[in-house]
Amino acid sequence: MESRCYGCAVKFTLFKKEYGCKNCGRAFCNGCLSFSALVPRAGNTQQKVCKQCHTILTRGSSDNASKWSPPQNYKKRVAALEAKKKSSTSHSQSLTHKDQAIAERLARLRQENKPKSVPSQAEIEARLAALKDEVQGPIPSTQEMEDRLAALQGRVPPSHTVRPAHQAPDTRTQAQQTQDLLTQLTAEVAIDENCQPRASASLQNDLNKGAARSQRTNSQGQASQSLEEEKYKLLAEAAVELQEENTRQERILALAKRLAVLKGQDPSRVTLQDYHLPDSDEDEETAIQRVMQQLTEEAALDEASGFNIPEKPAPGSRAQPCKAEMEGPQAEEEELPWCCICNEDATLRCAGCDGDLYCARCFREGHDNFDLKEHQTSPYHPRRPCQEH
């Protein structure tokens, strides 16, 4: 069962909290427990009590029976009910038990079939007028309700927080923004120029105005001279860079023609458009190295594809196997004939370890039982340089 106020029967909620009367101990809301009195149970201290306990504690109990007598309407209803019971008991005394049960059922049916009292039009209008005349408190606004809820939750009320100012997005294009910035800078320069005559006027009022004028003339001459020197310096740097660029292009073209001659191509058909020219910011050595790398890669591709490679003359001496045998290892990195772990002379090659060389002891120690069974080995004999006869 939901807990309700003993005085107004309202439910206890978050906003309607439950309080207890210090005298009678019943549960009341804050509105019904608005009286204060000295309570003997609490050591004759001022406590919150209900209206009934406040009346008893302040005025004292009265022995007058008329004060506690029920209303007159209640007395009349009780008297009519007692008279009806007496008449029914006197009438039912002459009936049997079955007849009394039937009579009670008939009386109950008659009570149920009686038409209920319908209020008249005047009563309904009076009740509506009374409801309209009731004084209603002001309805709190949304802002007040949000502030109260924030206070209950322990937060800062929204009305006290500073809201950030709304800044509209900039819908201007980049060209418009640049133009506006230039206009702003022009206006600032104009303001600065307007402020300069005041300073010159203050200098004219000085007794040493002749010296000030000469100093200003000298400073202007020095500024113009420095601008001229800077202009000539920039022109000289541009000429040097242009000359370096031309020299670099000529060197790249010469290298490309030499490579074309080595390939057996016509060097007159080689142009700078066939190669990626370096940027002007690159160093000359870096650019040459990059172009050389590009040309070398192209030559390697041509050699791999067999395009435009001259045929090698067939050797006729007996030393051909030895030379062919020496060209392969010397073209690539020469293999070192010792163990890859202890640098002792290698005796076998392990195919399961990407062809690494081992001595017998390091091979046993570096392989477990599974590797010894799975890895295939072959004896290794270091290559010796052949002698021509």
UniProtKB/Swiss-Prot annotation:
Gene3D superfamilies linked to this entry: Zinc/RING finger domain, C3HC4 (zinc finger) (3.30.40.10)
Chain coiled-coil ranges: 226-261
Cystine bridges: none
Compartment(s) of residence: Cytoplasm, Cytoskeleton, Microtubule organizing center, Centrosome; Cleavage furrow; Midbody, Midbody ring
Phosphoserine PTM positions: 69, 219, 280
Pfam families per record: ANCHR-like_BBOX (PF22586), FYVE (PF01363)
Keyword Metal-binding annotated: yes
Effect caused by changing residue 64 to S: In strain: FVB/N
Function: Key regulator of abscission step in cytokinesis: part of the cytokinesis checkpoint, a process required to delay abscission to prevent both premature resolution of intercellular chromosome bridges and accumulation of DNA damage. Together with CHMP4C, required to retain abscission-competent VPS4 (VPS4A and/or VPS4B) at the midbody ring until abscission checkpoint signaling is terminated at late cytokinesis. Deactivation of AURKB results in dephosphorylation of CHMP4C followed by its dissociation from ZFYVE19/ANCHR and VPS4 and subsequent abscission.
Protein name: Abscission/NoCut checkpoint regulator
Source organism: Mus musculus (Mouse)
Gene (name only): Zfyve19
